[in-house]
Structures are given as C-alpha cells and as structure tokens.
Amino acid sequence: ITYANEAKMKYLGVKEETLNTVGAVSEDTARQMAEGVARQAGSNVGVGITGLAGPGGETPEKKAGLVYIGVSVNGKTKVNKYQLNGNRQKVRETAVCRALTMVRHALVEEFL
C-alpha cells in the first residue's frame, strides 16, 4: 500500500510527470501502480488502487468515492474507473472487492 506519492515513485515506478500532470487519483497512476507492483514482486499479476475515499481531498473534478483500479496480468493491463458510495471504510471495502473481481476476470480471460 503506497499512500504517499514518494512511495508510489520509489517502490512502484510511478512517473513524477504523471503525478504532476494528472494526479495520484487517475487512470495513468493506477496503471503504473499495477504494472510496477507486478514488476517489483516478480509476479505475473499486479493490482493498483488509487482513489479518494473521503472525507477530504475532493475537487470539483474528483469527488469522494472516485476510485481507479488497475489490474496487470502477464503484461496486459486494464484500468476501471468507479464512483463509489458510502463512508471511507465502505469505499475502501468496495474497492477491494471490485479489484478482486477484476483480477478473477483477468485471470479467466488470460488462461481460458
């Protein structure tokens, strides 16, 4: 789990330019996180979740509950955008469930 932008760059290889231009909560960041964690772990599968669980941090363009989930399987990466409802804990729990569902679908597509 990398909350800080510095950790995203240092451990997952997220580009500083990405964070400066589109922000930490973005499709590009989720993609780079998923690919970076797979690379760092020497794994065929990587998951990156970035979002605004709230409260706080919202902007007119990015509301609380906005989540991007990236899943990378064997170098193929897909990112989904979600606008989730609920309090901070509910948003986090729902994001994890959506991420696991995405992993399952990606594995089925890759291996069947």
Region annotations inferred by a language model:
Residues I1-L112:
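Short alpha-helical segments enriched in small residues
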